[in-house]
Amino acid sequence: KLDQPAPSTQETSFIEKMKKTGRNIVVFYGSQTGTGEEFANRLSKDAHRYGMGSMAADPEEYDMSELSRLAEIGNSLAIFCMATYGEGDPTDNAQDFYDWLQETDGQLSGVNYPVFALGDKTYEHYNAMGAYVDKRLEELGAKRVFDLGMGDDDGNLEEDFVTWREQFWPAMCEHFGVEASGEDSSVRQYELKEHNDINMNKVYTGELGRLKSFETQKPPFDAKNPFLAPVTVNRKLNKAGELHKMHLEVDITGSKIRYESGDHVAVYPTNNTVIVNRLGQILGVDLDSVISLNNLDEESNKKHPFPCPTTYRTALTHYLDIIHPPRTNVLYELAQYATDLKDQENTDSMASSAPEGKALYQSFVLEDNRNILAILEDLPSLRPPIDHLCELMPRLQARYYSIASSSKVHPNSIHICAVLVEYXTKGVATTWLKYIRKSQFRLPFKASNPVIMVGPGTGIAPFMGFIQERGWLKESGKEVGETVLYCGCRHKEEDYLYQEELEQAHKKGALTKLNVAFSREQDQKVYVQHLLRKNKVDLWRQIHEDYAHIYICGDARNMARDVQTAFYEIAEELGGMTRTQATDYIKKLMTKGRYSQDVWS
């Protein structure tokens, strides 16, 4: 990065860009998995439908202190689509913006704004980032022109967004004195260019950044430049059960990739070739045609929806998410291509905010988990041009896994515990594109501090790395505190993950105590929280007297809450506290970094 020239003020000024291109609306997004960016693009597209000039913008690419100049543009509006990440934190691309908001005392009078927040109710800090931006902008003198929207990914995020958006635009039309008429027209963002005579060395084959980066792999490896890592071990962990829990080891020799126990590894999946081929067949196209989709807006920072030039086959295999159910905006744009009136009405209805349309989308698309291929197969007259479909589908996102190894013991490989919903070898690639994401999940600086790890099911993954590292420290002659694990599964003989490794670690003393809850082995279900209560005296000593660090990994919806409640109860009973005092006690442990969670819903 050192030899890259610093971007000029012109490039980092969204105000100059808006003035130059005649836009009055800017939609900023904080996005970790692509949804916030997708919603921002949809709002920007909406504005064009109403005849207003708009641009979606990544706050990381611009100087956000320029918000104070927004009033220089007549009828201006800044929309914020802000996702919350982790424990109430901003997304990576919104971190600098968040820091600026906290530190600035600049005046933002004359700035009109609304905020749509993206979050998940199962997490304690639900929509913390969106709520903070909404409140802080007002404190700095900006004017909220529409209520804060709250999107809940644990419920129906798409419906929350559509409902907010349907009320937002009529209010904005009134605010700007604009006629609300353009809603029915489809706006194309990209135009198709077919390359009949092109040097194939200039065609992308799945690379995310630099062309030919797979042939000449150069560090540093990150989201734009992932490492092509061979999978050296791929074995099934559970003996029975519906899900297939796999232990994978990927070779990172020569990559200079460094990782710590508790980090996440991001893996880019590829789509199933059967689905890709069937899409090509249904839409009647040669998937190996070389194409580019070029942005019709020449001033946009985003020249293409994915790396171009490429083939339809590469786009559908490596770049586009064709597996998840499509969002309503995709159906809205595709409805016009249905030649059968009934198919068109149904597709239109599912894209609307009418109660019956929402119910149809919920049952037909979400509950039945229909991807775009299934929808096209079920609506035989719906045959959109493939380039429009490629424009509309969201980008395929990396999947994050907790690393199940310690780099002290395994410096040249990364271990992963992954669940395959459908067990078929085609679901596991022989090479994986990957990079590392740092996490807050860290072993205590002082090895003499006890650690209490709670991780049922695949939540055990990061603790395999922790146990390996504590064992390594012990063998190196360090004083290591108690290492205590609470894990769980349904049946000992079916889905006890890493049984041999755990029993071996316990035998060698790397693991001081191994507590396993088998939930279905007896009449009364037993979960990890029951074992915590059972061992309350030991736990309270470890936490209150020996300064233990607590780590929770796994399901956010039930397990993490139930475990937290168990800790409250232990603090009440053995610490002589009220529930309020016990809650404050655990919150203080969180603030000090002694109670960490890596949870998902």
UniProtKB/Swiss-Prot annotation:
Native source species: Salmo trutta
Protein name stated in the entry: NADPH--cytochrome P450 reductase
Positions that bind FMN: 31-36, 83-86, 118-127, 153
Binding site for NADP(+): 458, 519-520, 525-529, 562
Gene field: por
Signal sequence bounds: none
Annotated membrane topology: Single-pass membrane protein
GO cellular component, one term: endoplasmic reticulum membrane
GO annotation terms (biological process): response to hormone
Binding site for FAD: 399-402, 417-419, 423, 427-430, 600
